[in-house]
Amino acid sequence: MHKKHTDLGEQSEVEVYGARVHNLKNIDVSFPRNELVVITGLSGSGKSSLAFDTIYAEGQRRYMETFSAYSRQFMGGMERPDVDKVSGLSPVIAIEQKTTSKNPRSTVGTITEIYDFMRLLFARAGEAYSYVTGKRMERMSEDQILNTILKQFDEQPINILAPVVKGRKGHYRELFEQIRKQGYLKVRLDGEILDLRPKMQADRYKIHDIEIVVDRLLVAEADKKRLNTSIQTALKLAKGIIKISDQANQEYFFSKFLMDPESGISYDEPQPNTFSFNSPYGACERCNGLGTIFEVDQASVIPNPKLSIMQGGLAPLGEYREIWIFQILKALAKQYNFSLSTPLKDISQELIDIILNGSDDVLTVPVAYNSWNVKNYQIEFEGIIKLLEEQHERRGEEAMADLENFRSIKPCPECEGARLKKESLNFKVADKNIYELACMDIAQLAAWFTELETRLSDKQNVIAKEILKEIRARIGFLLDVGLNYLTLDRTAKTLSGGEAQRIRLATQIGSQLVNVLYILDEPSIGLHQRDNNRLIAALKNLRDIGNSVLVVEHDKDMIMEADHVIDMGPAAGVHGGQVVAQGSPAQLMKAHTLTTDYLNGTKAIEVPKKRRKGNGKTLVLDKASGNNLKNVTANFPLGTLIGVTGVSGSGKSTLIAETIYPILNHHFFRAKKKPMPYGSIKGLEHIDKVIEIDQTPIGRTPRSNPSTYTGVFSDIRNLFVQLPEAKIRGYKPGRFSFNVKGGRCETSQGAGLKIIEMNFLPDVQVPCEECGGRRYNRETLEVRYRGKSISDVLDMSIEEAVEFFEPIPAIYRKIKTLQDVGLGYITLGQSSTTLSGGEAQRVKLATELSKKDTGNTFYILDEPTTGLHFEDINVLLGVLNRLVDHGNTVLVIEHNLDVIKVADWVIDLGPEGGAGGGEILFQGTPEALVSCERSHTGRFLKAAL
């Protein structure tokens, strides 16, 4: 057993009294502190309601209470959860599955702070190299400069020059005047020494180099004092750089800063922000540190070059109308001598570039307000895309999204995707620059840092000692949570929910906080069985340093390794919300609950008696090479249940979500997203559509609910319109909608609730006093079908609705599928925002199932078992098998062995993640996979079969 950390006088348990959030049935529950506690139970049984909406919400609210009332009103309310009392609570940190930020500047390196420590390492211990000659840069003290000049130019006449302008245009009248007033007599302009005279100026449009001639002297030991004074003056004038020219007009540079003595380029002293792509001091100026640039995609803007601009040849603009943008194009046509009626294919490419991207010339645009009032506007034309952007920005985000269709993302030509200035990329530690390190996967990076001391100088080792300790610790934690295949430059928005969550977990372990209650939501998502033990060890590590760890989890290993388990149930939704068993895993096994039945083998997901062979047709993807895929060829037998497996990072999502799905989506629905590179695809003619079912919420507003999402609400409204009472009153379907005026309660605008703003207290939702929470006005509610009003129907659970609507096939079919996927407990009008990820996914599944079946559909599900209990998985597999039995193809990306063992065909990728993956190790039946030596999946599947 691990050592317990309990302070004297401290409560040893977290106690929750009277929890009633969502479906919790006024429960009292307690669990030990400083232990690993798992909450398990069916999807919808109240696990998240207890862990996140009660315990975490209360901890968060207490933290908010510490702020002043004035600050709280700006923070948005933290509602007090519906619970009588929570005691023994430490500060809470929740690590959820919500994918991290959509910010393109957020990367694995910045989230874990490894990149920040690497910036510090490069700023303090990096060596600079010239980007011109590749030689190591030097810096000298004033004494070293003096001694070098004495030695190198002994008994030779030299000019001591202070460079003040390097490679820039301008007439520099003021500069020459300023130098003259300081008492200098000569300057060197573009290599030629000239006398300074009043009103002197250079050619304004040429690029110039200007140096002040500080002194001309014969170098000799006797003149050392004069030489020293001149050097110091020149260094001051030119901010630390001086130039020497000898008799032969050869030039030599010296600097107090980092400098290349051959080419004369110098770098500023490196600071940590020199290596930050989020700082103007480090970011590449072309792409502002993003590594990519948007380019106008000419083919999308001009899809049909046979049309003229008047006929709508420019897709974003459409046909000619009397609007400002066309007035500008008229003026442009006049200036460049072309016609808006000419087909675009007959206009030169040079002019097309000007139309799209603009030019430096000033345009005169005449605008006629009426026949006698014409005004001329002078504008700089920046191209139609830029103009549209400005207009769209005023119209909000959706309009900006339309514009994305006309632009494509390309790697920045300046930094080639490295995000940094060339100066920053020429600082090296042990022959690697910071971008080269950011491109290594975590496993390679760990190896590189292990041997680093032997490759550094003594001075570098002293400086780097503490930094290396921090970097190694953080890399170690990433390895512990199974993320060895990620690279530091991977952007946060490309991470899956499970990866993002485990990165946050590694960051938390890295912070080494103690006396905290961590609450995690299924950290094993997207994690292969192989890495499970490491994850459990990482959670135990958090516990052993003195924290409480509360995990919502369905994974068998995690449940059995916990110190304490809370099993919620007995069923889901209104039938759940109670603690059916709790205690150590050993105590739990003695109880009789759905969970324990699956744990001790009383119940199990059966292996099918025989595998389906499919319909004999195959979809073949050839030579897929996106991300880490190594030119793989994948066979998808149609009419089967296909499982795509492999360790995390082996290339499953690249193969399916980024290659196969975009290809099919483009083929059937002309979708814009480009697939990753591949050779060819055969067999598309055997499929008639593709459907992807993921776990994103089905609606983000309280007005969205299962009946509106599945479309059954329209049928129900049409039914109510057919009723005699509705016909007499002349009601249309809109009368029964709570989203439009007419039949809804106008006081609450059909929400049934009023939100009362409480300034610095959380907003309070109260039932609307007009309709009493029923959403509709009195007249609408008077129309009844079999004694029920439209509001009563929305309050029915799916189970009740199935019985109620049995006589009406159109409605019955849609509601029955919701019951078939195991959602009998939710109500028709339940707000989508209250559904869990697993529930939302099943609403989508039911929606697809209720559609007329063509029997040739290709379904793609990415980890459908997320958030599902063993019993839920059984129900889900029943649904998927039904789809396949109708002739459809169902493809699941999955780690769950219960799903893999019932698949007809398995495609296993690997053998490792990242660069070590990307091969297809095996394609065939689960039985044959077991004997594949290189496959980690096969090893674990053996036990399941």
State the predicted function of each range.
Residues 1-945:
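Conserved phosphate-binding elements of NTP-dependent enzyme cores
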